[in-house]
Amino acid sequence: MKKKAMALTVAAMMAAAMITGCGQTAAPTVETAADTTVQTEESTADTESTAADTAAADGESYTIGISQFAEHGSLDNCRTGFLEGLKEAGIEEGVNLTVLFDNAQADTATASMISDNYVSQKVDLICAIATPSAMSAYNSCLDSDIPVIYTAVSDPVSAGLAKEDKTPEGNITGTADTLPVEAQLKMIREVLPDATKIGILYTTSEANSLSTIETYKELADDYGFEIVESGINTLADVDMAAADLAAKVDCISNLTDNTVVQGLQTVLAKASAAGIPVFGSEVEQVKNGCLAAEGIDYVALGKQTGAMAAKVLKGEAEASDMPYEACEGANLYINTEVASDLGITFPENYEADAAEVFETVTVE
């Protein structure tokens, strides 16, 4: 029996008919919140175009909806990778693929409106980026045969999207961005040998954050840490919560919490004022001013998701039969400018071992 991952709010249901801002046309690509231009390596571009041209010549074409919960680097990278994964499978935007894209701007009611709209337009597939959008898409598609492929969902089981054995709770599957918490704790201990308290800021309504914090708590003692958490409800809460948390801990470890990531510059400012570092959870956060991260490559995760979606679109597999997949391994990212500003010296092997070293802070 299908079950709802999250009850739709009354406001979302009343507003579903008002989603004129998400209205799409027959153009090959419709963008209402962000640019979905995808860049691929020149060495593979010709092969991918040929595959898509062949599919188009055979009369195969698809329309998909991409619902992204918030606008920040990791989710943008997921979307880029997702379209690259489809392209590598011969499904190319503007050739045999129409993409309807909408960004919920970190609002769950808007996410529900977006997925409801895609269902009314009878798209061939919905790609949901981040846990709240995935839960909304799942609910919207309960009474339809539209498959949902999600990405950047940290814990599909706690979100009600999958069973413990990774099999789907309906016509929905995708990829999980479960954070490498143990690798992160090990790295923090190496960088801050005298630290005892790690602060974590999270949104109380994000299931992915709640489950990740539990993992932190389970493992923290093994590395001599105490986890100090602070919950927020909206982006407006970040300023006060970050300042209060920074005064109590030796460092902050950032999650992939969508609301907190949107307020990352505020978190960084409060931490800097307190003289403590912020550790990120993926490459964009380190680029934007976090000290370091054992994190995930979200472009690669998106490509993995795109490959799964291509199988569903081509009729090679049913989403309801595909266990969700997880991103394997972690990459080390460091920012030497941040380290210098804080008077922190990385272990001598870090620059050589890092997947990427940022020498400056770049905020886009």
Regions found by a protein language model. Give the residues of each.
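Bacterial lipoprotein signal-peptidase II cleavage site
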Residues: 5, 18-34, 38, 42-45
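Hydrophobic alpha-helical segments within soluble ligand-binding/sensing domains
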Residues: 56-58, 155-197, 296-317
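Pocket-lining segment of extracytoplasmic ligand-binding domains
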Residues: 207-282
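Beta-alpha junction/loop-to-helix N-cap segments that form part of ligand/metal-binding clefts
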Residues: 100-163, 257-272, 276-279
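An alpha-beta-alpha
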Residues: 64, 82, 173-220, 322-339
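Hinge/cleft segment of the Venus flytrap/periplasmic-binding protein
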Residues: 311-364
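Extracytoplasmic "Venus flytrap"
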Residues: 62-89, 100-109, 205-209, 259-260
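Short, solvent-exposed amphipathic alpha-helices that sit
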Residues: 74-90, 183-184, 208-225, 266, ...
